[in-house]
């Protein structure tokens, strides 16, 4: 089995190719076909888009940029928290990274979060400094964040489902077409982490080796 075939098989094992509904017209470029009213996503297209997103993340690490993760699905909390800890290290803030996004102004209000937190202690009102990239999970529900990031010209990396509306899809800089299963989100976060941390090691920002990184991610 070739490396490409092995990677595609790994994607198939995550269920990334199983779209939940019929695809919107703009998504059909990523669709292999349909079955029982559900879109079958082309795994080759998913892999191409995942590589593009990973390359961007590596360049971001080289420029010493920062990433902010946006998630509302509790099934992904543990995965994304672990990813955030590995990428952000000592600067990781559990409350900022893991709390739910429930109202507008996530990015545009990022410079004045304190006046809200006294009344809404369980909410997350965004980073205290502008991120260089926003990674969005459950992009259909996080359309307001995508619009804000686009307005502020912040690149967006997002896992996209076949029914994401065109107005939001067009504003995602690096769309990764896939079903957001727990297995795929874990794979996606692993790829992001490997690329970002490996580049940090090259720059001497993080100590360790690629071998250490691989062992850590496999644990």
Swiss-Prot record:
Domain of life: Eukaryota
UniProt gene name: RPS2
Protein name in UniProt: Small ribosomal subunit protein uS2m
Complexes and interactors: Component of the mitochondrial ribosome small subunit.
Predominant place of localization: mitochondrion
Signal sequence interval, chain numbering: none
Pfam families membership: Ribosomal_S2
Family: Belongs to the universal ribosomal protein uS2 family.
CDD domains reported in the protein's UniProt record: RPS2
SUPFAM superfamilies with a match to the protein in the record: Ribosomal protein S2
Listed GO biological process terms: translation
Annotated compartments: Mitochondrion
Listed GO MF terms: structural constituent of ribosome
InterPro entries: Ribosomal_uS2 (IPR001865), Ribosomal_uS2_bac/mit/plastid (IPR005706), Ribosomal_uS2_CS (IPR018130), Ribosomal_uS2_flav_dom_sf (IPR023591)
UniProt keywords, alphabetically: Mitochondrion, Ribonucleoprotein, Ribosomal protein
GO CC annotation: mitochondrial small ribosomal subunit
